[in-house]
Amino acid sequence: MTDKKVTRLRRARKARLKMHELEVVRLCVYRSSQHIYAQVISADGNKVLASASTLDKELRDGATGNIDAATKVGQLVATRAKAAGVSQVAFDRSGFKYHGRVKALADAAREAGLEF
């Protein structure tokens, strides 16, 4: 693995351990060069409560690797999480910088009603 990826994974592991100690539901984000994925994971980490990505049928047709797509994924995962009874989450950025697509997803989820 490259040094860049190793440092990202170390940052992610450190943040996830803290969230596990606090026993909070987390909104986990993963971004690749072409897609972005978001999952709401239970406090014990055993169950995915809601998920959305640019591979979903509603979002697959448009552009998938830009800020607009990340905004749509954020709105979709927030509505699905609220339907599952989740209103408060901890934001797990998986070691990615809080910038660009990751920030757009977080802002859209906040606007749709999730509390971080």
Curated annotation (Swiss-Prot):
Superkingdom per UniProt: Bacteria
Gene3D superfamilies assigned: 3.30.420.100
Cross-referenced SUPFAM superfamilies: Translational machinery components
UniProt xrefs under Pfam families: Ribosomal_L18p
Assigned GO CC terms: cytosolic large ribosomal subunit
Keyword Ribosomal protein: yes
Alphabetical UniProt keywords: Ribonucleoprotein, Ribosomal protein, RNA-binding, rRNA-binding
Function summary: This is one of the proteins that bind and probably mediate the attachment of the 5S RNA into the large ribosomal subunit, where it forms part of the central protuberance.
Subunit-level organization: Part of the 50S ribosomal subunit; part of the 5S rRNA/L5/L18/L25 subcomplex. Contacts the 5S and 23S rRNAs.
Protein name, as recorded: Large ribosomal subunit protein uL18
Gene that this polypeptide is encoded by: rplR
